A protein has these predicted regions:
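N-terminal leader/auxiliary helical segments
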Residues: 1-86, 94-256
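Aromatic-lined, polymer-binding surfaces characteristic
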Residues: 91
Length: 256
């Protein structure tokens, strides 16, 4: 993570800097680009309440360095659809690898819990974008894939199957809609039953708080830095796919 809106917003802002060919491909396969922006996060939604081998793939892939992960997945980007998913996936890595060290630092020093800070940053971005009641924003509309698109995505995440990918995406959309339900007291009560702070903290705060002002501003600096960093990462990926040139130190960090 960051949370879902930050990744989706980040991907939309990247589009203007894409080359014309990539923009045309994204228009053709927009669902793949949009879901690529969420990267391996989709596996966290497979079954959030029970540990499963498929659900744990989210942690497995997030722990891999960019060099390890992208050296492997570039082999799946030969098709137009595969490249479009890769373009979104690179956006996920670019934002995660810059923001996660900061989020983990704030969690370690007791300033904020991991998911709590990410949910607040989503609220901050939505408010900045003119959404009057950010906690009511339903961002699930783009969370969908066709069966064929699930086949494309599964190739990036062995041993996940297309059926696994379909379940992850469908559950992600359901969870997103549930979190913005009109009866927040009922939603909060159900979340508390999980006894998992990471799940409870996904409920976006209704209002900002002074304790977040500095952290939101620092997260925004990292977010903007990631926007500037993306073209260089894409250039390295393209060179790697053309010539086999090893990925450089920019890909050394893990997703986080």
């Amino acid at each position: 993570m960051p949370a879902n809106y930050a990744h989706y917003r980040f991907g939309k802002q990247l589009l203007s800097g894409m080359c014309p060919n990539d923009r045309r491909s994204i228009q053709r396969f927009r669902r793949l680009y949009d879901m690529g922006l969420h990267g391996p996060d989709i596996f966290f939604y497979y079954n959030p309440l029970i540990k499963t081998a498929t659900g744990q793939l989210g942690g497995v892939f997030h722990a891999q360095s960019g060099q390890e992960f992208f050296t492997r997945v570039c082999a799946q980007a030969g098709s137009e659809a595969g490249r479009v998913y890769l373009l979104g996936l690179l956006g996920h890595y670019c934002l995660d690898s810059l923001c996660h060290p900061y989020v983990e630092k704030k969690e370690a020093d007791g300033s904020a819990r991991h998911v709590e800070l990410e949910s607040e940053f989503d609220r901050y971005l939505l408010e900045s974008d003119g959404v009057v009641l950010p906690h009511t924003y339903d961002g699930s509309a783009h969370m969908r894939l066709t069966r064929g698109e699930c086949v494309t995505v599964a190739l990036f995440y062995p041993p996940a199957t297309p059926a696994n990918i379909n379940a992850c995406v469908r559950n992600m959309a359901r969870a997103t809609r549930f979190l913005v339900g009109k009866n927040r007291k009922h939603v909060r009560r159900l979340l508390r039953l999980t006894r998992s702070p990471a799940i409870e903290d996904q409920l976006m705060p209704e209002h900002g708080d002074d304790r977040w002002l500095w952290m939101d501003s620092e997260m925004l600096v990292l977010y903007n830095r990631a926007l500037k960093r993306y073209p260089g990462l894409l250039s390295q990926l393209d060179e790697h796919m053309r010539t086999g040139e090893p990925l450089g130190q920019d890909f050394a960090p893990a997703f986080g």
